[in-house]
């Protein structure tokens, strides 16, 4: 018998592990740089291993989901998380940190590959949308918790090794919750066929969603990744902004099921694109207290992107199966990694342009940062058009089916 509640709680703790690995590792970067005499470029490469391992294992996990099952994928996630944590703690230097971060990234990708389709197989309709949103609530929620833990432990002068051990706690918890459990079977037999999956994945609607996912992911992660650098001179505290965004995202996702049930995924995605565009526009034009208002609009916009893109695939393109969900998620992570370098180039060119106008110091930093954010408005701007098309596309499809 399948204990769906225990499996769901195990999935949540696995995603908290992912979030902790993101936020705690970010919090200890200065300590790692000091301990191992690492420069900024080396720290950047270490961080990139997290993003490299994630989509690789997510896509491979989706490909073999129905062959080996979610149980074995999560067992592999536990092994790679554990090895990554231990290797980080006992790392002798740069190479060891590269390998350990890659292993943790692989474990994180396995979590997405196994848990999304598992939740979709165990539930349907409103319940599925509710639980997918509440599952994904724990990524921003875990980032808030992890950031607070890292901040507290750093202020208590506890070493970075002790902070990494915290990630092991949630790893052991999810392993215990999954231990000995019966995992759900696919609701449709055809879903287990890779051939049927691929056939569904070359449909116009799937390819459309795949393109949208590239833009939703960078709309969400782009501004957040550069918050500290871009907004440091705006008169608002970057870490408070990040905490406000992730906290609101967690709350929004908790109540996401009811909102999706009322407005459908297409309506929610369209509204999310509008709010995200407004949020980034305010970031690019406002300073002081209004930056926090911008953060509220931005958080309410991006919080429903990821879970509802996955939920749309699960509900509207079910024959794409676990592979379809994993490819969509992988596209999100891949586009994020690609666009990071582009955004960095925008910052450099904006800084040069504003410097040529005679600006210096914090005035230069603010002008360059806000100019870069105006470029980022294009991501949700394009999505408004695409999701409006999707909204009427699906509404007409429902009318035709009726």
How does the language model describe each region?
Residues 23, 51-59, 144, 246-254, ...:
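Residue-level signature of mid-helix packing/kink "hotspots" within the transmembrane helices
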Residues 25-26, 202-250, 339-344:
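Extracytoplasmic gate region of multi-pass secondary transporters
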Residues 90-100, 284-294:
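Helix-loop junctions at membrane interfaces in 12-TM secondary transporters
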Residues 126, 131-186:
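Helix-loop-helix hairpin linking two adjacent transmembrane segments in secondary transporters
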Residues 6-38, 116, 223-228, 339-343:
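Extracytoplasmic
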Residues 100-137:
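Cytoplasmic helix-loop-helix junction between adjacent transmembrane helices
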Residues 161-179, 370-392:
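Symmetry-related core transmembrane helices of the 12-TM Major Facilitator Superfamily/SLC fold
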Residues 56-95:
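Conserved MFS/SLC helix-loop-helix module at the cytosolic interface between two early adjacent transmembrane helices
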